[in-house]
């Protein structure tokens, strides 16, 4: 199942994350580290909203949501462009939150784990 959505700059990142979680050892490591279901809801420049569910509680999977976002342990709500910056370590999640660009619903501590997940599953070479 594809996790990419036309019109969202974050689509390639979700594809990389999905492929990274296909590695069972990486998925198990992420589940151990996070132990939460994270719902990520993004809004693109056209104002369209799309959600993805990152299940790091049991399955270690990522899925695109069709329709309303389900309830998870934590929900991150932000603009598509800000999520791309967050995933690429160009901006800190705390800074986005403090500036009102990131809304968090649910377990705030679990929300901080998302940055570590991207670092662990990043396929790009470490310099």
From Swiss-Prot:
Residues annotated as region Hydrophilic? Answer: 43-52
Named from the GO MF annotations, one term is: lipid binding
Task: Give the induction annotation.
Answer: By alkanes or fatty acids; repressed by glucose.
Q: Does the keyword RNA-binding apply?
A: no
Region Hydrophobic, annotated ranges: 33-41
What InterPro entries does the annotation carry?
A: SCP2_sterol-bd_dom, SCP2_sterol-bd_dom_sf
- Its primary localisation, in coarse terms, equals other
Is Glycosyltransferase among this UniProt entry's keywords? no
Which biological process annotations from GO are given for this protein? fatty acid metabolic process
Function description? Is involved in beta-oxidation of long-chain fatty acids. Its exact function is unknown, but possesses a nonspecific lipid-transfer activity, despite the absence of a cysteine residue thought to be essential for the activity of its mammalian counterparts.
The UniProt entry's GO CC annotations, sorted and at most eight, read: cytosol; peroxisome
Annotated SCP2 domain ranges read: 14-119
**Subunit details:** Monomer.
Q: In which pathway does it act?
A: Lipid metabolism; fatty acid metabolism
- The entry's protein name is Oleate-induced peroxisomal protein POX18
Q: Name one Pfam family in it.
A: SCP2
The record's subcellular locations are: Peroxisome
Which chain positions lie within coiled-coil regions?
Answer: none
Q: Which UniProt keywords apply?
A: Lipid-binding, Peroxisome
